[in-house]
Amino acid sequence: MQEKFEQSVKNMLEIIGENPQREGLLKTPTRVFKAFEFLNSGYKQDPKQILNDALFESSNNEMVLVRDIEFYSLCEHHLLPFFGRVHVAYIPDKKVVGLSKIPRLVEVFARRLQIQEQLTEQIAEALMEHVGAKGVGVVIEARHMCVEMRGVQKANSTTSTSALRGSFLKSEKTRKEFFTLINSAKQVRF
């Protein structure tokens, strides 16, 4: 598989008019393979296993929020990066998940070819399904290189998406609390 991938990179370099044999490009096919292997490593990870290994009994029934989780992903349309921050909240139902597992869950889905809308929904659905939360709220704010580097070339534009499930969707009070918390003392730095 690696050999086939590397040959494809060499072919691409030739198509754009480069010489894959010049010094600066000799190791590029291997580097690109390793980069893509890492950036798409989420396909080899099971969200259920990550979350179920860290579920703990709890009487807590108040909102748990992990804010400003940085992520990087590749747009499935152009294979260009998009990156930003994810805010994830849930209301437990007799079980809480280890806090470090929420950023790991984000990484599992971000390290797949993606669109931001789908990434937002996948995080919310995984928490609802595998943690058994009463509700989940996910907001992603991201910059897309397919918008900034090509096409309309609008630097520094930000795309925001949200996915609300359970009590976050049904209760205006819960929704308001979530959006207030993620916007309080907000400092967006990319």
From Swiss-Prot:
Keywords, in A-Z order: GTP-binding, Hydrolase, Metal-binding, Nucleotide-binding, One-carbon metabolism, Zinc
GO annotation, cellular component aspect: cytoplasm
Pathway the protein contributes to: Cofactor biosynthesis; 7,8-dihydroneopterin triphosphate biosynthesis; 7,8-dihydroneopterin triphosphate from GTP: step 1/1
GO biological process: one-carbon metabolic process; tetrahydrobiopterin biosynthetic process; tetrahydrofolate biosynthetic process
Entries under Gene3D superfamilies matching the protein: 1.10.286.10, 3.30.1130.10
EC number: 3.5.4.16
Homology family: Belongs to the GTP cyclohydrolase I family.
InterPro entries assigned: GTP-CH-I_C/QueF, GTP-CH-I_N, GTP_CycHdrlase_I, GTP_CycHdrlase_I_CS, GTP_CycHdrlase_I_dom
Organism of derivation: Campylobacter lari (strain RM2100 / D67 / ATCC BAA-1060)
Uppermost EC category: hydrolase
Protein name per Swiss-Prot or TrEMBL: GTP cyclohydrolase 1
Subunit organization: Homomer.
Lineage: Bacteria, Pseudomonadati, Campylobacterota, Epsilonproteobacteria, Campylobacterales
UniProt catalytic activity: GTP + H2O = 7,8-dihydroneopterin 3'-triphosphate + formate + H(+)
Pfam family, one: GTP_cyclohydroI
Amino acids binding Zn(2+): 75, 78, 146
Domain of life per record: Bacteria
GO molecular function, one term: GTP cyclohydrolase I activity
